[in-house]
Structures are given as C-alpha cells and as structure tokens.
From Swiss-Prot:
Protein name (Swiss-Prot/TrEMBL): Imidazoleglycerol-phosphate dehydratase
Secretion signal, residue range per the UniProt entry: none
Gene Ontology annotations for the cellular component aspect, listed alphabetically: cytoplasm
Disulfide bond entries: none
GO molecular function terms attached to this record: imidazoleglycerol-phosphate dehydratase activity
Coiled coil: none
SUPFAM superfamilies assigned: Ribosomal protein S5 domain 2-like (SSF54211)
Pfam families, alphabetized: IGPD
Gene3D superfamilies documented for this protein: Imidazole glycerol phosphate dehydratase, domain 1 (3.30.230.40)
Localisation: Cytoplasm
Length: 192
C-alpha cells in the first residue's frame, strides 16, 4: 500500500511517500546530509520505497527536522499497516558494520514503545547531536504504533548509527511483509 502524506508547521514542511511493498527506491532530501544517508540505508535495505522532502528551520538546529520526519514517517507506516491483515507483525535483524553491531526487534501491533540501548562517543554525528537519533526512533514508534527494541555497540559512531538504521529498516520490511499464510489480523484479540 503506497501512502503519501504532507505536514506543514511553522518549523517544517514535509512531503513523504512510503510503500512497504516497494523495491527499495529512495529519494530523501531533508537538508541534513548525514540524516539523508541514514534514511536511505534504512529504506534501501528494508526493501521499501521512500521519498521524503523536508524544508526545516535548520538555522535553529536539526531537532525539528528530525523529529517531524519521525512523526510523518510514523504516521505513514501506521496508515500502511491499517488493520494489519496478513502482515507478519514481528521481525528482528542483527546487522554488523565492521566493529559495530546493531540489533533491532519490532512488533508492529499498534503499541508504540521504544527501548534504546547504546551510546555514541562523539558530541555530534554528521552535525547532529546523537540524542536526536533516539528521539527520531521514539517519535516514529509512537506515531507508527510500533514497539522497538534497539541495541547497538561498537567503537565507530558512524558505523554504529548506520548499522542501527539498516537493522531497523530490514526488521520493518520483514514485519510489514505479507505472511502468505493468512489474511487475518495477526492478533489473538482480533484487532491491534
């Protein structure tokens, strides 16, 4: 299901499309090159299509751009899930990048929650304060209704961050894939 959303505030203007049944076609332009690189890796390795154009108040800092991208992407994921009929719902990925390792486990069953374990050594990563990566995933998970457990270790901050985004993308792509076994909602409650 291809979802297109737009959101405009006094801080950001975002146009985004998300297709979990895509082929990994990506066109991302947030005005923050490192964030673009992370989102591109997430979508390409997750096998879903993502286009995202953001104009944000980067003269202030990157917080609003990153947070609002998480809001809109989360809303798009939630819309794509819909009732959840036929999706796998659960998935995980363990991804290395040289000395770094990222582990992501997801439940796309309508309950937004984030457990985030890992630290970066640098004060900025691609001119982004590292706490904004946790905030991005928190915002995305709350808006998408996804429970995510994210863990990462390593020595190189770039590698840790990239492995984390790729692992999230792979797990998301697998969780949203149609199971092929049933068209039912994957819940004993019968609903998310």
């Amino acid at each position: 299901m291809n979802v297109s959303l737009a959101r405009e505030t006094k801080e950001t203007k975002i146009a985004l499309t998300f297709d979990p049944e895509g082929t990994g076609k990506v066109a991302v332009e947030t005005g923050i090159p490192f964030f673009d690189h992370m989102l591109t890796g997430m979508a390409r390795h997750g096998g879903f299509d993502l286009t995202c154009t953001v104009t944000g108040d980067l003269g202030v800092d990157s917080h609003h751009t990153i947070e609002d991208t998480g809001i809109v992407l989360g809303d798009a994921i939630k819309a794509a899930i819909g009732e959840g009929r036929g999706i796998r719902r659960f998935a995980h990925a363990i991804i290395p990048m040289d000395e770094s390792l990222a582990q992501v486990a997801l439940d796309c069953g309508g309950r937004g929650y984030l457990v985030y374990t890992g630290t970066f050594g640098a004060r900025t990563l691609g001119n982004i304060p590292p706490d904004l990566f946790e905030h991005f995933f928190y915002t995305l998970c709350i808006h998408a209704g996804i429970t995510a457990h994210i863990r990462f270790t390593g020595r190189n901050d770039h590698h840790q961050c990239e492995a984390m985004f790729k692992a999230f993308g792979i797990a998301l792509g697998e969780a949203l894939a149609k199971s092929g076994k049933t068209k039912e909602i994957p819940s004993t409650k019968g609903t998310f």
